[in-house]
Amino acid sequence: MRHLAWLAAVLLLALVVTLPAQAGTPTDQVRQYTDQVMKILENPELRSTDKRAAVRKVANEVFDVTETARRALGRHWNGRTQAERDEFVTLFADLLERTYISKIDLYGGERLKYTGEVIDGDYALVRARIITNKGSEVPVEARMLKRGDQWLIYDIIIENVSLIMNYRTQFDRIIRTASFQELVRKLKDNREQFMTEKAGRSS
């Protein structure tokens, strides 16, 4: 599940569309990044660090991390100050990067096949299937929200399991059994541990 989740997060930036889409649709918004991301992932001259930096830049443009963080925190969001929200969004964005973008080296040529989309006002659902190297297909959905004239991804669903709901369950458990401050501490500790291990690998 973790492998498919990060894979979908990256590949949704490089959605292979097999059906024509009308101008201005959520699919069109995602398609803008297709050539860009695939060239990054498949460029043998780019180092892993360069690929991660390039994919991170694209991800920042197509993912609404603040919305994802807000929904992941659920009912606990409303009780937080603006400073606490800002800090949490930053920590959550770092967590997503460590969980998904840092693993782009695992990319092995998988593709996404577009299967449809549903638009309801400022919300949209883009459906696709991950095509693995063995030919099997895994259903994936991207939930999107319109911000101005741009459609942004705020949730990814793999085989009916939501990225947001997965994190919400974990975060809610920590807050209920301890506190919001404990959640923040854990996220900071996780980030520090990752940076320490990263420094050790590069030394």
Features from the language model and the residues they span:
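Positively charged n-region of N-terminal signal peptides that target proteins for export
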Residues: 1-5
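Solvent-exposed loop/turn segments at secondary-structure junctions
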Residues: 94-95, 132, 159-163
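Short beta-strand edge/turn micro-motifs at domain boundaries
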Residues: 137-165
